[in-house]
Amino acid sequence: GGFYKTGPGGLLHTLQLVGHAGENLPPYAVAKQELPELAVRAAVASAQQKEPLVQILEGNTHHAKFCRRVLGRVLSYAASLIPAVTESPQDIDDAMKLGFNWQRGPFELMDAIGHSKMGELLEEAGLKVPDILQLDQPFYQVDGSALTVRHADTKYKPFSLPAGVIRFQMKRRTMTPILENEAASLFVLNGFAEGVNDLRLVEFHSKANALTDASMEIVAAVSEDHGSGIIIHNDAQHFSAGVDLNAFRNYIERKDWNGIDAFLKRFQEAVCKLKYTPVPVIGAPSGLAAGGGFEVLAHCDKLVVHTNSIMGLVESAVGVVPGGGGIKETYLRWFNKTHSWEDAAWNTWMNLGYAATGSSPELSAKLQYFLEDRDETVMNRDRLLTRAITLIGQMQDNYSAPQKPILKFAENSLFEKMSDFMQTGVERGNFMPHDKVVAMTIAGVMIDTDGQNSEATENILYARERDAFIKLAKTDCTYERISSMLDYGAPVRN
């Protein structure tokens, strides 16, 4: 406990009060960045697709005891509401998830903890074990291909949802992926809509859904085994926070520039194959879709977006450029909007240089990240996947893969205009010196800087993105930004 403020360099400082017995308050000092051991264990477990709750409840530290007391009391109260308030635990779980934005309801949490462990928690807190917990059986279990819920009468009854609602995190319990690894899975969807079958669904499920080589292996694989349509979707709080920065820090520390180039090339090849797959491809995100996460969506035919979605390319904040087709796709979108390669380059440059994001689909539309004449929004997150499946069915009959575009580089005169803009900003204190380096590197991807190549292809833009990324990765300032983001949660300004 204590008071916090941000000091020089963006470091968090704290005035520690816990255990202070004197009259004079101690001075501010740099806050401890270390997380409690059980929080670290829980984060590691979550990243490994294991149950994190088990980790925060084990041990005799004051953190673990606090977690046991709080969870014990909250979950005990929830269990006591059966059957007084409802016969079905699902009703309470749904109320907490829909009404209070819980990721899992209390009865789902009790299943995750284990009912015998729950009994220990309640006894430790001096609480009576509710009747519904006396029977050591899970509240949710799979019966054949159906998910069922244990009611107050101890009988298992079908897990029920309103018509048109699909919660994939629940439905996936009854499904077996045809391909999976630690970061993503590939599922076949059948029977979710009349006449729409043999679909493929790609689900990311790494920590924060950060994209890795393993994630992109599944994206590449679905382009080969595409069925009758592809949906990119998951039910996590955030669709994807972008590419795993830890991987890039490791590459930089080893000076493995070929490794960075190979990683980016694999990413680009995966999204390029996705774009030209001979079946409809729909992205159905909710929450944050940033950086590489948005680059995957940018190569889809159409987006069905939850209204509470944030989209954008934020790479410049950590000193790099979008390296998975993000510059290329944004440049194309702005050209289709403005019909001018110079205007397209300027608008793309402003988007990426400011690391702009749209905090709603409407605001994303101003950045051309959400295309109002093509993409759709869905207000109820539970109906996102249903709408995506329906749209696949509507697109199937007359679908043909997009034609590969011919691009042009913007004229060299624009580069000088951009340089003057950045230099003025640096002199005024609006930008830091490395902001200009990053911005001009972004500009160099889209501008014919040598006056030799006016026309371009997607592959040329992909190559320029990789070169620009590696050029910046070799700078000390970019390494400092990436390290600051990973170590302190915000990039240093330099």
Language-model region placement:
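N-terminal glycine-rich phosphate-binding loop for ADP-containing cofactors
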Residues: 1-230, 235-237, 246-279, 286-289, ...
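Extended, composition-driven regions rather than compact fold-specific motifs
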Residues: 241-243
